[in-house]
A protein has these predicted regions:
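SF2 helicase catalytic motif II
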Residues: 59-65, 71-120
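Conserved motor-coupling elements within RecA-like helicase/translocase cores
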Residues: 30-67, 75-79
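Flexible beta-alpha connector loops of hexameric P-loop NTPases
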Residues: 41-49, 91-101, 160-164
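Conserved RecA-like ASCE P-loop NTPase motor core of nucleic-acid helicases/translocases
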Residues: 13-21, 41-43
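Conserved interdomain linker/interface between the two RecA-like ATPase lobes of SF2 helicase motors
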Residues: 1-4, 110-167
């Protein structure tokens, strides 16, 4: 993630990184600042209105290169977006259950098309919708190699006595 953000920023473009939860936004924003990114701003709904307004204005004026936030960060007036990275794309927090109904993944895709930005959907276990969509549309799916030492055994739970503990 950090390497991709550096490449995008070096090109003079900006990055939006979405995470499903507020604590993840704060932690990732701090991590990016520690790793040398000084024009990083964190944006989410739990900020006070005064802080949120100040950050919105800094973003609008182009003072910020990287925005880390929850799904509301997609609607910020950040210009020249070169990267939209959706971390844990399978998380249900990206889907809004209230009017207006929207899914952060779809908004990210549409904004990425409008901005001609790279859109990355990151997940350790992708949602079936995205996995199927990428396979049908012949998009690039990067899969991590299976780590040695991990052993998987498929167990038919119907064959085990009731109360058996499986770990």
């Amino acid at each position: 993630l950090i390497q991709v953000v550096e490449i995008i920023c070096h090109q003079g473009r900006r990055a939006v990184i979405l995470v499903p939860e507020v604590y993840q936004a704060e932690a990732l924003g701090e991590h990016l600042r520690i790793s040398g990114k000084d024009r990083v701003e964190v944006y989410h709904g739990h900020l006070s209105s005064m802080v949120r307004s100040a950050r919105w204005e800094r973003i609008r004026q182009g003072e910020v290169q990287v925005v880390v936030g929850t799904r509301s960060a997609l609607f910020l007036p950040i210009s020249n977006v070169g990267l939209i990275w959706i971390n844990h794309e399978d998380d249900p927090s990206y889907k809004d259950e209230h009017l207006p109904y929207y899914h952060g993944r779809e908004v990210a895709r549409m904004r990425g098309e409008c901005e001609q930005a790279l859109v990355v959907y990151g997940s350790t276990c992708p949602s079936l919708e995205m996995y199927g969509k990428f396979r049908r549309q012949v998009r690039k799916v990067l899969e991590r190699p299976w780590h040695e030492g991990h052993q998987v055994e498929i167990i038919n739970l119907r064959s085990l006595p009731y109360g058996t503990i499986v770990s």
